[in-house]
A protein has these predicted regions:
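Aromatic- and acid-rich polysaccharide-binding/catalytic face
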Residues: 172-174, 346-369
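N-terminal module-boundary/linker segments of secreted carbohydrate-active enzymes
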Residues: 101-194, 454-473
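Loop/turn elements at helix/coil->beta-strand transitions in domains of secreted/extracellular proteins
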Residues: 41, 137-141, 167-170, 206-211, ...
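Substrate-binding cleft of secreted/luminal carbohydrate-active enzymes
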Residues: 141-148, 387-473
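Solvent-exposed alpha-helical segments and adjacent loops
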Residues: 1-113
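Alpha-helical scaffolding within the catalytic cores
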Residues: 153-161, 195-198, 267, 334-351, ...
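Substrate-binding cleft of extracellular glycoside hydrolase catalytic domains
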Residues: 184-325
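Aromatic-lined carbohydrate-recognition surfaces of secreted/lumenal glycan-active proteins
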Residues: 144-146, 282-285, 313-344, 387-398, ...
Length: 473
């Protein structure tokens, strides 16, 4: 290969160094390999920026799947793009040198890129029709899993699911408060994770996959003592009726931190909207349980606060509507009723039909395969006349096995099948069922492969046919 003389701002490309600090190391290595392959020029890596230019730097925080740029600033080359677009932009930038005539090429000009390769995704309306079709079709069920409560990316859960079952889930759940996407606390050097998450979601939805998001909102009360314990941010109480009124009143002391979190969450959901991704959004889940601060049950001191959740739900709904988040399907998903308090009832906090697109139950069994109380709760939400789902599904604490061998004796996917058999026999309808990560996951329970191979189960490979079916009708 004949080496061309490639100039950027008067400096030869071979004199540049690729800055490989932190998360950018992946991109720096990719750049060096690509340059060597395409031009025969070998670029050195550097752990830090040179003071006087000739750095190649990378910014993978772009939230638009197909967009990015190359900027020449103060003698440096800066590649900006998404997790998807950045490697492609690097190649396209270098292609100009390969395709240009002559032995000396000047690549100093900055350039904006729109690769125009964002996949065409289904619409929110089409998603709703698919769920309605499955809901009305006996013994047909969309299933999937929640991404675990760490900084795991969608691809991590998808790999685990495939390894356990030989197939991919048709629905995937994530949480803005617990999966590494807690925007208020995400440091700048990790914001590339947001771009990666968006791009992986786009790729998943392009195959027909369904994405759901919730949020374990942080307790906004100034006196709530938080510990280092995982998940502690969503516990405690905020007070009586006055505190709840202040929570939905702009500019109050308790409203400000909540609105700040809500704004950042809306920013992320807006990025999904801008990429064409419909989202099942289920805020304030399990509000009737009393274990999260976002509950009408506010402990012995304050008792039950009537209309706490309906008012908060409408506040979130109105704000997200103002933000133009028209890609959301709103799902009301209480816990299965488990107490004598009237506020434990699954319908107690229902905000009204005009604020809800579908409903669900978070259902954790303790080994009784009769339908029992959970079934009665499911019957209640079915009376609302909307698509109903097992929004979260898992086994209770006594059924958690320390190993897979131990789990075999406690709770397996065969038990899940038995529960579903009984539900369908009793006339229940279900749109989707989503297990809840880690040891509450289909992939943790033995016999997942047999479960996913059942005729009733729709996995990711079956989703395109469902969308085609509803488009034909």
């Amino acid at each position: 290969m004949t080496e061309k003389k490639i100039l950027i701002a008067g400096t030869e490309l071979k004199s540049f160094k690729a800055v490989a600090n932190g998360a950018n190391r992946e991109w720096a290595l990719h750049f060096c390999r690509t340059v060597a392959k395409m031009t025969g020029i070998y670029i050195e890596l550097s752990e830090s920026e040179a003071l006087f230019g000739a750095n190649v730097m990378f910014d993978a925080t772009e939230m638009m799947y197909s967009k990015g740029s190359v900027k020449i600033e103060r003698g440096n080359i800066i590649f900006r793009g998404s997790y998807h677009s950045l490697p492609i932009i690097i190649e396209k930038y270098l292609e100009k040198a390969i395709e240009a005539d002559g032995d000396e090429i000047d690549l100093t000009e900055s350039e904006e890129f729109d690769l125009c390769d964002t996949p065409k995704l289904y619409t929110k309306e089409e998603l709703m029709k698919v769920l309605e079709y499955v809901y009305e079709t006996p013994d047909l069920l969309i299933v999937g899993d929640e991404v675990d409560n760490s900084r795991s990316m969608p691809s991590s859960m998808l790999r685990k699911y495939f390894d356990a079952s030989g197939t991919y889930p048709a629905i995937m759940g994530m949480d803005l408060g617990r999966c590494g996407l807690k925007l208020p606390t995400l440091p700048d050097n990790e914001r590339h994770l947001l771009s990666r998450c968006v791009c992986e979601i786009v790729d998943y939805v392009a195959q027909g996959g369904i994405i759901t998001f919730g949020c374990h909102f942080t307790n906004p009360h100034k006196d709530y003592e938080r510990s280092a314990a995982a998940g502690n941010q969503d516990r405690g109480h905020i007070g009586g009726a006055d505190a709840w009124k202040d929570l939905v009143t702009e500019g109050t002391e308790i409203n400000k931190p909540f609105k700040r979190e809500l704004t950042l969450d809306a920013d992320f959901l807006s990025a999904l909207r801008d990429n064409g991704v419909p989202v099942i959004w289920r805020p304030l889940h399990e509000m009737n349980g009393g274990w999260f601060w976002f509950s009408p049950i506010q402990g012995e001191e304050y008792g039950v606060v009537k209309n706490a959740i309906p008012d908060l739900w409408k506040y979130i709904y109105n704000y997200f509507t103002e933000r133009g988040l028209d890609n959301l399907l709103w799902e009301y998903s209480p816990n299965n009723s488990n107490g004598a308090n009237p506020a434990n009832d699954v319908l107690y906090s229902y905000p009204g039909d005009e604020y809800v697109d579908m409903v669900g139950i978070d259902w954790y069994t303790v080994g009784n395969y009769e339908i029992g109380g959970s079934g009665r709760s499911y019957e209640k939400i079915m009376t609302l006349g909307k698509v109903a789902n097992l929004a979260e599904f898992g086994q209770g604490g006594p059924l958690h096995g320390a190993t897979r061998d131990a789990q075999e004796k406690l709770f397996t996917c065969k038990h899940v099948d038995a529960i579903l058999d009984r539900m369908y026999a009793d006339g229940y309808k279900i749109g989707y069922a989503m297990s809840y990560a880690e040891r509450n996951s289909f992939v943790w329970w033995p016999h997942c492969d047999e479960f996913m191979a059942s005729d009733r189960i729709v996995d990711l490979s079956g989703m395109p046919a469902l969308f085609e079916k509803i488009r034909e009708n």
